[in-house]
């Protein structure tokens, strides 16, 4: 995530090399998005120590404000930036060769007999996911 005024905001994608050169604002170590990013880096023999991390903040709103003010860039879920994307105040760029797709699992007891309810839940979930596409 970066400010719409950032020179890289016009690109369709950012590389890890470009990201390493930018001031990076991260969420706390307990953040799922941060952990997905960290896991991807580790799978490519990299770590967060390879980046210019300037702040770690747990408040998403504060991170977005700092990014808007061009203090740094961040790794955030696209879904938390929907309002800013619509307003044009932030840009969300995919990172080249980086997939941060979360796996969602639905568990239910083997004796559960309400398949119609499961189908309804899945339909609603899929509708909600489509609403996040910008």
Model regions and ranges:
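Residues embedded in well-ordered beta-strands
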Residues: 1, 7, 23, 73, ...
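Short Pro/Gly-enriched coil loops immediately N-terminal to beta-strands
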Residues: 1-3, 12-20, 88, 95-103
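Thr-Gly-centered strand-to-loop micro-motif
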Residues: 2-3, 27-28, 76
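Short helix-loop capping/hinge motifs at secondary-structure junctions, enriched
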Residues: 5-16, 111-117
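Secondary-structure junction motif
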Residues: 8-9, 23-45, 115-116, 132-133
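Alpha-helical segments flanking ligand/cofactor-binding loops in enzyme cores
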Residues: 17, 64-65, 119
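Hydrophobic hinge/microswitch elements
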Residues: 33, 38-90
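A late-sequence structural motif
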Residues: 91-134
